[in-house]
Regions:
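Small/aliphatic-rich secondary-structure junction motif
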Residues: 2-54, 136-139
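General small-molecule cofactor/ligand-binding pocket signal
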Residues: 39-41, 87-91, 142-144
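Short, solvent-exposed amphipathic alpha-helices that sit
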Residues: 26, 62-74, 98
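Short, well-ordered secondary-structure micro-motifs
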Residues: 23, 50-53, 100-101, 124-125, ...
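Glycine-rich, Arg-bearing micro-motifs that act as flexible, cationic patches
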Residues: 111-136, 148-154
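Structural beta-alpha unit
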Residues: 1-2, 79-112, 157
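Short, hinge-like loop/turn segments at secondary-structure boundaries
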Residues: 55-59, 104-107, 130
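Acidic, proline/glycine-rich short linear motifs
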Residues: 42-69, 151-157
């Protein structure tokens, strides 16, 4: 930013779940209202590719193409919603580990935004990062409830 301060980025982990959309909207609205940015992280699970080398490479490329497509679709939605153009980050590995590695490697990421499921469990990523890491997280974590309406998300941002 021009005044010498770092831009705060909101990190969102992208997947195919409905709660991901709530987290995306929250991050985009907060970025819009604070002059920040959004980083969308898509993590491809490596255990999906435990096949013969040629087949594994083809599957890896297909997974990467699907990740790029998903991120592209969401980027269009975010830009239309609030004028935010997010950064993309596609990684392969354990989701929780990749989230932590990205946070450590990008000092501008200031908040991790996660979407919680509507059931009794908030979901595996929320459980893993918040319940197990808790006070050891290097940045604040915002958990957006799965049952929260889009209107309510907009109102609190």
């Amino acid at each position: 930013m021009e005044d010498g301060t770092e831009m705060r980025k909101f990190l969102v982990v992208v997947d195919e779940t409905p709660e991901c959309m709530n987290a995306m909207r929250f991050a985009a609205r907060r970025a819009q209202n604070t002059g920040g940015g959004v980083v969308m992280l898509y993590v491809i699970a490596p255990d999906d590719f435990q096949h013969w080398v040629g087949v594994a490479e083809l599957m890896r490329q297909e997974a990467r193409d699907a990740a790029e497509s998903r991120l592209g679709e969401l980027a269009v939605e975010l830009n239309a919603l609030c004028g935010v153009t997010p950064e993309f980050n596609i990684r392969e590995g354990n989701r929780a580990e990749q989230v932590l590695e990205l946070i450590e490697s990008d000092s501008e990421i200031g908040v991790l935004v996660l979407g919680a499921g509507e059931g009794e469990s908030p979901g595996p990523l929320v459980s893993q990062l918040v319940a197990k890491m808790g006070g050891r997280m290097p940045i604040p974590v915002t958990v957006v409830p799965g049952a929260m309406s889009l209107e309510r998300i907009d109102a609190v941002c």
